[in-house]
Amino acid sequence: MGTYRVVEHIKDRSANGHSFNVMAIDFKEPSYVKVKAVSLPKVGSLLTVDGDSVSLDGKPLGKVSEKKSADDVRVSLKFDIKYTGGYSMDGKTIYLDEHFPKFFTVEGKNVSTVESIGLHHELPEKWMSDNGYEYPYAHEIATGIEKMYVESLGVTWKGYCDEVDKNLRRVYSRLLVSLGYMDGESIPWDEFISTVLPYTF
């Protein structure tokens, strides 16, 4: 059983307007569900997911039609990526720049950037992109997920952003010469999506 926050919803046009596709994310793991819902919950509502059954405020809402989890992906730290992070077309690999710190200290607490940027930003961004949302909106949703995760560590968002920004400026100054090699084969450009817009908060 888990708790998921609604981040978006649309009418299911294939069901004559009588059901809705609801997207919700559990920021802790993180994991994502798409729900075939009989009513329209507000964005920000908390859903309870038990198996494939979904409820809102103790009342049945619908069924899970799709589920994705951080457990389904791997994070690669092997490549020189100018814009720090990105993801493969199939969503099975998250990429973080090899020169970006994997941990840093914010307000006396260690923060894993593999978790905060890789799994709590890049991954939700990919989930939203796969649902047809354009980059700026997917990025906005992902930044909100990242913020919830960071604050759950007892770190302020401003303190975290200041530390990320300091390190991003250093990474931005590097030239992306090549993507390197993985498993003995070079990665073709059409198999890699880099986050080409600046990382903004």
Residue ranges and their predicted role:
Residues 44-53:
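Flexible glycine-rich surface loops and low-complexity tracts that mediate binding to linear polymers
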Residues 28-41:
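Beta-strand/loop nucleic-acid-binding surfaces
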